[in-house]
A protein has these predicted regions:
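N-terminal, active-site-proximal structural segment of metallo-dependent hydrolase catalytic domains
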Residues: 7, 21-170, 200-212, 227-231, ...
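Active-site His/acidic residue clusters
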Residues: 231-252
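Short, structured patches in soluble enzyme cores that scaffold and shape functional sites
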Residues: 185-187, 224-226, 235-238
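N-terminal export and membrane-targeting signals
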Residues: 1-14
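Conserved hydrophobic/aromatic beta-strand scaffold that supports enzyme active sites
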Residues: 54, 170-172, 219-223, 235, ...
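Active-site metal-binding loops of divalent metal-dependent hydrolases
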Residues: 57, 98-99, 176, 238, ...
Length: 417
């Protein structure tokens, strides 16, 4: 990823495309046995569990307001393809990364009403009565020269890289009520306030270091009421560990953005330093149920990540890693070659189709990680092998949807009524 320019990433993201369908390892790879494509499938799942998904949908644009214009009518092809992927997998709750923030939730409602609620290519519409959007740090001017180029302004000097405020934002859609009065956001949490942080000591000025925000977008704790129980959707989209220099400022930030959730879910002293945007301190109380979702831009073994970054969640004692796989990822890795040939992570676990030669190759960067007190039922990655149903929604650059796959997990909510 270090070999891509920021310009290339912005333009590619506007086109991008998704991937495949699978089952929990070590079950046989293929189309997930409960990847619902109809309301009947959802009714069946109601008896067994809750499906939570994450999808970097690449619904970002290079100009402020363009996404809202694209979604205001039902004929944007990329949006139709994204909606079809969601309809095929029919999650009860889904986080979309790289969905430009528009104040008032207008873009979120437009995508829901004009695309998700409309049958795409014969698939049953999905109804999401509830959604959550909030401001993010991308594109918000910092007033500081954060890239040390001698000038103040531009995407690299924003609190999170972005051409305009809200670019690369997030939205959560839910079939179940969101407890809005209990939502916590951490957009303004300062990086230096994390004990033992990896903030570069020889790159930022003291003035800059004192003001830097940790989240490149934001961190959200969104409680969802499932029957009489609550499941916390912990959503984020850490910065890519690339596009920097030997100081590794983005790799270090990515590591600490991931660590934030690892500390937050402990429910112990290690979370006392945390404060939210309303000033409330502390992490998630022990015993609470959660699913960590998002594009974390970190593979546990490959790519440019700071050593051990993803392992902070994958090896966490409170987290269950379902290790979802897909057949499409295996085929893509073998056919594309390049950096994929030397990867340590099994190709079946990949969730994103990145440049292969010279680097970084396809990676596992998108996660849906439930707490261990949510019994795991199934999980998958929507990346069908060529010729399988849905494979027309995937492909190589320019992608019909996104360069990331939708990742889902089915969990049982104990005592749900």
């Amino acid at each position: 990823m270090r070999l891509r320019s920021r310009t290339a990433v912005v333009s590619a993201a506007a086109l991008a495309g998704v991937l495949a369908v699978t089952t929990v390892a070590p079950a046989a790879a293929g189309e997930g046995p409960r990847a619902a494509s109809s309301s009947k499938g959802h009714e069946s799942r109601d008896k067994h569990g809750l499906r939570v998904a994450t999808y970097n949908a690449s619904l970002n644009r290079g100009e402020q307001g363009q996404l809202l214009r694209d979604l205001s009518t039902p004929d944007n092809q990329q949006a139709r393809n994204i909606a079809q992927v969601i309809q095929i997998n029919d999650p009860d709750i889904v986080l979309l990364n790289e969905f430009d923030y528009v104040p008032g939730g207008r873009a979120a409602r437009a995508f829901r009403d004009n695309y998700l609620a409309v049958s795409q290519n014969g698939h049953a519409p999905v109804d999401y009565p509830y959604h959550y959007v909030a401001p993010v740090n991308t594109g918000v001017p910092s007033g500081l020269d954060l890239n040390q180029d001698g000038t103040v302004g531009g995407p690299d000097d924003a609190w999170g890289f972005g051409l305009f405020p809200g670019q690369y934002g997030m939205v959560i859609y839910s079939k179940y009520p969101i407890a809005r009065d209990r939502v916590r956001t951490f957009q303004h949490f300062r990086w230096q306030d994390m004990p033992g942080n990896r903030l570069p000591t020889d790159y930022y000025t003291p003035e800059q270091a004192a003001q830097l925000r940790l989240s490149s977008k934001s961190h959200w704790d969104v409680p969802v009421r499932v029957g009489h129980k609550t499941v916390h959707v912990l959503a984020a989209h850490p910065t890519p560990p690339s596009f920097d220099g030997p100081e590794d400022r983005n790799g270090r930030r990515n590591n600490d953005e991931i660590r934030f959730w690892a500390d937050y879910i402990t429910g112990t002293k290690s979370a006392r330093y945390i404060y939210d945007d309303a000033g409330r301190r502390g992490g998630l109380p022990r015993g609470e149920r959660f699913v960590i979702v998002g594009d974390y831009n970190s593979d546990p073994n490959d790519g440019d990540s700071f050593p051990g970054a993803a392992r902070q969640l994958l090896d966490n004692s409170r987290v269950h890693d379902p290790q979802p796989t897909s057949t499409g990822a295996v085929v893509a890795s073998a056919r594309q070659g390049g950096a994929n040939r030397t990867h340590v992570t099994r190709p079946a676990l990949d969730t994103a189709d990145f440049s292969d030669d010279p680097a970084p190759g396809n990676l596992r960067v998108d996660y849906a990680l439930p707490s261990k007190n949510l019994p795991l039922l199934d999980a998958g990655v929507f990346w069908p092998a060529p010729g399988r149903p849905g494979s027309e929604l995937t492909g190589e650059y320019p992608f019909p949807t996104s360069d990331h796959s939708l990742v889902w997990v089915d969990v049982k909510v104990p005592g749900r009524r």
